[in-house]
Amino acid sequence: MSRIGKNPVPVPDKVTVSLDGLTVKVKGPKGELERTLPEGVSVSQEANTIVVAPTSTKRISRERHGLSRTLVANMIEGVHNGYSKALEIVGVGSRAQVKGTTLVVSAGYSHPVEMPAPAGITFKVENNTRVIVSGIDKELVGNEAAKVRAIRPPEPYKGKGIKYEGEHILRKAGKSGKK
């Protein structure tokens, strides 16, 4: 049995969960999420907790047990508190701004790069160099933050580029030159 999967998921007071087979709908103060869990697990609601259990002892069922429990926990956390990921823009002349729901990044290219926000995601910019991606779906927030970082990944010599807040960039020494 999965060590993560065997723990029940607590449901806060302001969150409602409805189950329909393997489809889980979670509604909370920040919004509503729906997801179909993979085959091989069963989901049940007991009092203020959600319990995920494997349907058999097959390997695939045991593998999906912990995954399914974490997916449900992330959905509940998302509609209750939400998720956010911060990125820092390092480099002279590199900056970001928000126009409507579109993030516009000037990252050293000949043109500014525009990223429209998908449904459920909001971009916020502080001091022109700090971008905050927020939303209720953890997977979507992480994917959009990765797309922003991919515009100009940090380079190892001077560290210029877009990096996650708190990310450590491995630095390389430059050429040593002739002596």
Curated annotation (Swiss-Prot):
It comes from Synechococcus sp. (strain CC9902). This is Large ribosomal subunit protein uL6. The keyword Ribosomal protein applies. This protein binds to the 23S rRNA, and is important in its secondary structure. It is located near the subunit interface in the base of the L7/L12 stalk, and near the tRNA binding site of the peptidyltransferase center. The gene is rplF. One of its GO terms (molecular function) is rRNA binding. GO terms for cellular component: cytosolic large ribosomal subunit. Keywords: Ribonucleoprotein, Ribosomal protein, RNA-binding, rRNA-binding. Part of the 50S ribosomal subunit. InterPro entries: Ribosomal_uL6-like, Ribosomal_uL6-like_a/b-dom_sf, Ribosomal_uL6_a/b-dom, Ribosomal_uL6_bac-type, Ribosomal_uL6_CS. It comes from the Bacteria. The keyword Acyltransferase does not apply. GO terms for biological process: cytoplasmic translation. Belongs to the universal ribosomal protein uL6 family. SUPFAM superfamilies: Ribosomal protein L6 (SSF56053). Gene3D superfamilies: Ribosomal protein L6, alpha-beta domain. NCBIfam families: L6_bact (TIGR03654).
